[in-house]
UniProtKB/Swiss-Prot annotation:
Classification of source organism: Bacteria, Pseudomonadati, Pseudomonadota, Gammaproteobacteria, Pasteurellales
Any one GO CC term of the record: cytoplasm
Protein name: GTP cyclohydrolase 1
Assigned keywords, A-Z: GTP-binding, Hydrolase, Metal-binding, Nucleotide-binding, One-carbon metabolism, Zinc
PANTHER family assigned to the protein according to its UniProt record, in alphabetical order: GTP CYCLOHYDROLASE 1, GTP CYCLOHYDROLASE I
Species annotation: Haemophilus influenzae (strain PittEE)
Pathway noted in the entry: Cofactor biosynthesis; 7,8-dihydroneopterin triphosphate biosynthesis; 7,8-dihydroneopterin triphosphate from GTP: step 1/1
First-tier enzyme category under EC: hydrolase
Annotated gene: folE
Length: 218
């Protein structure tokens, strides 16, 4: 079993404490066993849909799906995959806003298991620590790689960054298209969903929040 880092444990505990952790159970089977079991079930699902799995285009699809679920699009359910964090002491006394815009978001709607596609913007005011800019992208990707609802994802990101950076002064903005709306049901291809979460100065000071939103809404 892979070791879970202290940062990952702290983030998970913070999410649980706030009641915003993804509803998950700890698997009792090894990954290989889970892949095998998922493939068998997907084989039956595809047969029930009416697909002929003897066709060479379809025969490996159950195995592909099993690998995709465990190793790729739902890999963020395993905190052993949480990005390795190297926190840097804020020796330069950086006090201005650090902001990363247009982070690619590709997640999966937990209601219909179809794609959520969008962008994430994250900002924070450093206190004692800063992190490499790419770590912000990696944390977004980690929480995207699990069945999600956008509202909870936004709150999870806020809490994760607050926990790692040891500051409340964090803002998260998410703009996404949901394929459960675009590809089924109403089939609206134009609409998108916006969610945001604020802590510390972003929550308390309107001008700071406006400064953040002025750049993400361009």
């Amino acid at each position: 079993m892979s070791k879970i880092s202290l940062d990952a444990l702290n983030v998970r505990n913070a999410l649980i404490e706030k009641g915003i952790e993804t509803p998950m159970i700890d698997p009792t089977q090894a990954k290989d066993e889970r892949r095998e079991s998922i493939a068998k079930h997907m084989h039956e699902v595809m047969k029930l849909i009416g697909l002929d799995l003897r066709d060479d285009s379809l025969e490996e699809t159950p195995n592909r799906l099993a690998k995709m679920f465990i190793d790729e699009i739902f890999s963020g359910m395993d905190y052993a995959n949480f990005p390795k964090m190297t926190k840097i002491k804020n020796q330069m006394k950086v006090s201005e806003m650090v902001q990363v815009n247009d982070i690619t978001l590709t997640s999966t709607c937990e209601h219909h298991f179809v794609t959520i596609d969008g962008k994430v913007c994250v900002a924070y005011y450093p206190k004692d620590w800063v992190i490499g800019l790419s770590k912000i992208n990696r944390i977004v990707s980690f929480f995207a790689q699990r069945p999600q609802v956008q509202e909870r994802l936004t709150e999870q990101l806020l809490t994760a960054f607050q926990t790692i950076l040891e500051t409340d002064d964090v803002a998260v903005y998410v703009k996404a298209t949901h394929f459960c709306v675009k590809a089924r049901g109403i089939r609206d291809t134009n609409s998108y969903t916006v969610t945001s979460a604020y802590g510390g100065v972003f929550l308390e000071d309107r001008d700071t929040r406006k400064e953040f939103l002025a750049t993400v809404q361009k």
